Design a protein with these regions (language model features):
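Extracellular beta-sheet/turn segments enriched in Thr/Pro/Gly and aliphatic residues
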Residues: 92-120
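Short acidic/proline- and small/hydrophobic-mixed sequence motifs that coincide with surface turns
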Residues: 33-37
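Bacterial N-terminal signal peptides that target proteins for export
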Residues: 1-7
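Sec/Tat signal peptide C-region and signal peptidase I cleavage site
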Residues: 14-20
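A short, solvent-exposed beta-strand micro-motif common in secreted/extracellular proteins
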Residues: 78-88
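Cleavable N-terminal signal peptides
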Residues: 7-8, 18
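Intrinsically disordered, low-complexity Pro/Gly/Ser/Thr-rich segments with frequent PxxP/GP/PP motifs
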Residues: 47-76
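Asparagine-centered strand-capping/turn motif at beta-strand->loop junctions
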Residues: 26-32
Length: 120
């Protein structure tokens, strides 16, 4: 009887979904443009999620040179993310392959027209 119970418990563990963890980082906006929306997607997945804000709060714009906290749900094994910034002029740019597992701060900027991100 104990054996069957143990097997049943083990099987439930296998059927459990992979839960996402709530993560955050500080985004430093050195893009030269005000940002109105930040979205994140696992690299190459094209599954965008908006920066999460607390219930009852309005999303805040990311001023040029400013620092804002970005909140998102991260799967346990996913480290490389794409960050999409939508600017006040309604254009958007994707900053690719940012390692968010090892970063507390991410700076985004442009080198000419090429999007560049630095994580630390």
């Amino acid at each position: 009887m104990r054996y069957r119970f143990g097997v049943a418990v083990a099987m439930l563990g296998l059927a459990a979904p992979a839960y996402a963890d709530a993560w955050d980082f500080i985004l430093i906006n050195n893009s030269g443009k005000e940002i109105t929306l930040i979205e994140l997607s696992p690299s190459g997945a094209n599954q965008w999620q908006k920066n999460k804000v607390d219930e009852g709060e309005k999303p805040k714009n990311f001023k040029v040179g400013g620092r804002n906290t970005v909140h998102f749900d991260k799967a346990a094994s996913q480290c490389k993310w794409e960050i999409k910034a939508t600017f006040a002029d309604t254009t958007s740019t994707v900053f690719p392959a940012v390692n968010l597992c090892d970063a507390s701060f991410v700076t985004i900027r442009f080198n000419g027209t090429t999007p560049v991100s630095t994580a630390s």
